[in-house]
Amino acid sequence: MSIIQSIIEKAKSNKKKIVLPEGAEPRTLKAADIVLKEGIADLVLLGNADEIRNAAEGLDISKAEIIDPLKSEKFDKYATDFYELRKNKGITLEKAKETIKDNIYFGCMMVKEGYADGLVSGAIHATADLLRPAFQIVKTAPGAKIVSSFFIMEVPNCEFGENGVFLFADCAVNPSPNAEELASIAVQSANTAKTLLGMEPRVAMLSFSTKGSASHELVDKVRTATEIAKNLIPDVAIDGELQLDAALVKEVAELKAPGSPVAGRANVLIFPDLQAGNIGYKLVQRLAKANAIGPITQGMGAPVNDLSRGCSYKDIVDVIATTAVQAQ
């Protein structure tokens, strides 16, 4: 069973309600058809009901709940509650009402109020359009110092990682994390590997240097982050700084990082910044024909997940299933 199939089966075992703000978007509707037919999750589609049904011609979304924020009985309450959340930031009630007309803001309020268990959006919106309301409304989880993102990477015919399965982070949220933030990303990712994927994490803190082979402040950041992360979760195998080949290839690891508990065996790859992470996952996705599931957020008060605007309907199914499992 593939990793995504195991996630789908787990989602089915304890169904959650996921809200989709892009209710009339064609790929989203095709994904909704599949999710509902397979019993992966219960769905709420946001938008004009006629537009959604017209766009869904030939698909079966009869089991989905369709809510138009502009006509919803929840609108006034959500606007008032949003005003209470943001009044210290200078927002007025009128501005709150205008803001809640946005489907993503409305959907985040549904999650905040407990009407839905999670939210998936981003097929036609930029990441910032999702993260802004998520941070304002859903906020970070108790004790979380940072919100980050990860991709589950399934690489076909791959001898590395966990039989070709990896967790890559952070590939979508934090442009230039400092050492403490990078350590938090590593800790979150290790926990996600355990709880979501059932993997024993072996975390590689990636760099262009392996164990002092180069000297630079960027290397120092990764090295410091590694020590912080080790202190935070001493029972987890974390090592760095490691170049990618040393992290994955046993023969290279024996030369560059002998004795490392991670080198040559890594299944969780922590990139030093967003440029490296975003480029890295797309290289593997396109050149190795990997299945890239994500970006999935970690550290939020409830699961609110982004999509790539280049996503397929199958990608949306995968993210909905993953979001549902996060909500369990």
UniProtKB/Swiss-Prot annotation:
Protein origin, superkingdom: Bacteria
Organism: Thermoanaerobacterium thermosaccharolyticum (strain ATCC 7956 / DSM 571 / NCIMB 9385 / NCA 3814 / NCTC 13789 / WDCM 00135 / 2032)
Catalytic activity: acetyl-CoA + phosphate = acetyl phosphate + CoA
Pfam families, per the entry: PTA_PTB
Keywords assigned: Acyltransferase, Cytoplasm, Transferase
EC number, UniProt record: 2.3.1.8
NCBIfam families found in the cross-reference section: PRK05632.1 (NF004167), PRK09653.1 (NF007233), pta (TIGR00651)
GO biological process terms, semicolon-separated: acetyl-CoA biosynthetic process
GO MF annotation: an example: phosphate acetyltransferase activity
Gene (name only): pta
Pathway, per record: Metabolic intermediate biosynthesis; acetyl-CoA biosynthesis; acetyl-CoA from acetate: step 2/2
Entry-linked InterPro entries: P_Ac_Bu_trans, P_AcTrfase, P_AcTrfase_dom1, P_AcTrfase_dom2, Phos_Acetyltrans/Butyryltrans, PTA_PTB
Similarity comment: family membership: Belongs to the phosphate acetyltransferase and butyryltransferase family.
Subcellular location: Cytoplasm
UniProt protein name: Phosphate acetyltransferase
One cellular component (GO) term of this entry: cytoplasm
Main location: cytoplasm
